[in-house]
């Protein structure tokens, strides 16, 4: 039976700190991809934000560390076998120290692919190939509590147009992690006699990463 996730009991954590970048000298094409970084100091279970030239498939993405050694670590569960060749980049340890606990509704969009028409005058049936995927976007209604530390952190990121790493942990332990932009002004909305809410939008920058535990 499928491990079904529901939007209940979901923990939402936002990056509160991002460590200085550690130089990455190589990323293998393997499953999982192995990262070379001298004296990186990471431990298994840490989350890192990767910047990468060449291997664009991992650029701007959040990964969990596994198989950590003094000068190397793995991108847990990430199969890089068919990815482009890595040339240079870095890794930054993420601290997910800010909790958001005021969200009341969620709508997700994006992640679907554009398709490119490849039909020629010789074809009898149209053909197409997948192009680029659209960015994943999560739109929430939040209880309007202007003193809430989580909402204050979201507004600060929004005001500064700063990227923040985000982690959703579902009740069955499945996780979604990504780097993205926050959009919120903490403007109050709602209807007569109902609770006051405020909209929050998070748009992924780079592809999300998922984990089963």
Task: Report the location of each language-model feature.
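Short structured motifs
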Residues: 123-127, 185-186
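Small/polar beta-strand repeat architecture
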Residues: 2-9, 14-44, 53-124
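Short conserved beta-strand and strand-loop elements enriched in small hydrophobics
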Residues: 46-53, 91-95, 162-171
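Short beta-strand and beta-hairpin "edge-sheet" elements
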Residues: 167-212
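Soluble sensory domains of the PAS superfamily and closely related sensory modules
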Residues: 157-161
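Short, conserved charged micro-motifs
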Residues: 147-154
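Intrinsic-disorder/low-complexity, polar/charged segments enriched in Ser/Thr/Lys/Arg/Asp/Glu/Gln
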Residues: 32-34, 135-139, 163-165, 177, ...
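Oligomerization/assembly interface segments of phage tail-like spikes and tubes
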Residues: 127-146, 194-209
């Amino acid at each position: 039976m499928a491990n079904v996730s529901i939007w209940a009991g979901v923990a939402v954590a936002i990056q509160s700190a991002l460590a200085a970048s550690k130089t990455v000298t190589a990323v293998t094409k393997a499953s999982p991809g192995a990262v070379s970084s001298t004296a990186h100091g990471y431990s298994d279970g840490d989350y890192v934000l990767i910047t990468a030239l060449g291997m664009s498939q991992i650029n701007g993405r959040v990964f969990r560390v596994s198989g950590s050694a003094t000068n190397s670590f793995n991108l847990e569960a990430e199969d890089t076998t068919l990815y482009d060749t890595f040339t240079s980049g870095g890794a930054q340890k993420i601290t997910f120290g800010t909790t958001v606990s005021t969200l009341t509704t969620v709508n997700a969009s994006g992640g679907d692919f554009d398709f490119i028409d490849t039909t020629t005058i010789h074809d009898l049936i149209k053909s197409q190939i997948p192009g680029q995927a659209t960015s994943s976007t999560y739109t929430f209604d939040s209880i309007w509590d202007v003193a809430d530390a989580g909402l204050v952190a979201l507004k600060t990121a929004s005001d500064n147009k700063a990227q923040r790493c985000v982690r959703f942990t579902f009740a069955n332990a499945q996780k979604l992690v990504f780097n993205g932009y926050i959009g919120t002004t903490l403007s109050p909305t709602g209807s007569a006699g109902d609770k006051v809410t405020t909209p929050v939008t998070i748009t992924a920058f780079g592809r999300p990463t998922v984990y089963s535990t």
